[in-house]
Amino acid sequence: MNVLRKIVKKCRDEDTQKPSPVSAPPYDDDLWLPPPEYVPLKELTSKKNMRNFCVNGEVKACSPNGYSFRILRHILRSFNEIYSGNHRMVGLVKVVVGLALSGAPVPEGMNWVYKLRRTLIFQWADSRGPLEGEELEYSQEITWDDDTEFVGLQIRVSARQCHIQGRIWCINTNSRACQLWSDMSLQTQRSEEDKDSSLLLE
């Protein structure tokens, strides 16, 4: 048991560095490659409460014995209760976490690291969402620990408003990202102006 505790401690404390400040990625940056079911859209016509954000997102899944997405989804179902960041940006964080986890992970010791660095376009309904010019630095660890296994999620999201053109994606409703957003109870409604885009309600 002591050995397991040491492993878990090492796993949690392996990387204590703060994420680097958000900077705009080059246009050809492919740190995150979307799965095949993501289809690029030409443009977003609506200008209603629309903002571009330069985003750095990282989700580090840590487990000495491996993990399954069933457990990750179970952990994320309690996201609203445990989220400790700026609540005006909780919708943005959910989108970034879902996109990051739907990409390809990179092994790092006992961890699997999912990273996302994009310029993303977000639309909020009415007066919801972050204030003009508001920035986010969010970091949190969520753990699942029972008699049989330990899984830790280290989530980091940095976001600041920017004026660089973002990439727009239409996502298949059966994609992994949509499953994760459903688990996290992401609140959206279809945009009246753009049939392929949604407005965030949080």
UniProtKB/Swiss-Prot annotation:
Plays a major role in assembly, budding and uncoating of virion after membrane fusion. Completely covers the ribonucleoprotein coil and keep it in condensed bullet-shaped form. Inhibits viral transcription and stimulates replication. Plays a major role in early induction of TRAIL-mediated apoptosis in infected neurons. Inhibits the integrated stress response (ISR) in the infected cell by blocking the formation of stress granules. GO terms for cellular component: host cell cytoplasm; host cell endomembrane system; membrane; viral envelope; virion membrane. The keyword Phosphoprotein applies. The record marks V95 as: Involved in the inhibition of stress granules formation and contributes therefore to virulence. The gene is M. It is found in: Virion membrane; Host endomembrane system; Host cytoplasm. It is a peripheral membrane protein. Residues 115-151 are annotated as: Essential for glycoprotein binding. Gene3D superfamilies: Rhabdovirus matrix protein M2. GO terms for molecular function: structural constituent of virion. The keyword Membrane applies. This is Matrix protein. Late-budding domains (L domains) are short sequence motifs essential for viral particle budding. They recruit proteins of the host ESCRT machinery (Endosomal Sorting Complex Required for Transport) or ESCRT-associated proteins. Matrix protein contains one L domain: a PPXY motif which potentially interacts with the WW domain 3 of NEDD4 E3 ubiquitin ligase (Potential). Homomultimer. Interacts with nucleoprotein and with the cytoplasmic domain of glycoprotein. Interacts with host ATP6V1A; this interaction plays an important role in virion uncoating after viral entry. Its main location: virion. Most abundant protein in the virion. One of its GO terms (biological process) is viral budding via host ESCRT complex. Keywords: Host cytoplasm, Host membrane, Host-virus interaction, Membrane, Phosphoprotein, Viral budding, Viral budding via the host ESCRT complexes, Viral envelope protein, Viral matrix protein, Viral release from host cell, Virion. Belongs to the lyssavirus matrix protein family. A motif (PPXY motif) lies at residues 35-38.
